[in-house]
Amino acid sequence: MPTSATAVAPSTGSVQKKDQDWRAILSPEQFRVLREKGTENRGKGEYTKLFDDGIYSCAGCATPLYKSTTKFDSGCGWPSFFDAIPGAIKQTPEAGGRRMEITCAACDGHLGHVVKGEGFPTATDERHCVNSVSLKFSEISSQ
């Protein structure tokens, strides 16, 4: 169930844990994706079709990563965002150069990939293709 979010500032500290500590707080699927760079099945993620107002945080360390205002339906089968909260993610080029791996800047958890230049009508022409299992959604309640 979504929780209420108040702040949208990314974590500035580095979250480091041993594998046994990550296993204690993550589900087996979360561990496989976040810590072993896996990918969840296309179209099966909890947040693929969620477009409520809120914040998407790292499921591993709770660092806010994406605002719902940057989420869009790309049709790829995973949650898609055109931009992250500044400083929240790291991008690392993969072999071939077309895709960039994205990880949480605080805990290095694998989130997914960024693909650029696909022509989506967004402000950045980027698609951050993120595994739902890497995320935790917090609804922003209207006041």
Swiss-Prot record:
One of its GO terms (molecular function) is peptide-methionine (R)-S-oxide reductase activity. Zn(2+) binds at C58, C61, C104, C107. Residues 19-140 form the MsrB domain. This is Peptide methionine sulfoxide reductase B9. Binds 1 zinc ion per subunit. It comes from Arabidopsis thaliana. The keyword Oxidoreductase applies. The gene is MSRB9. The keyword Membrane does not apply.
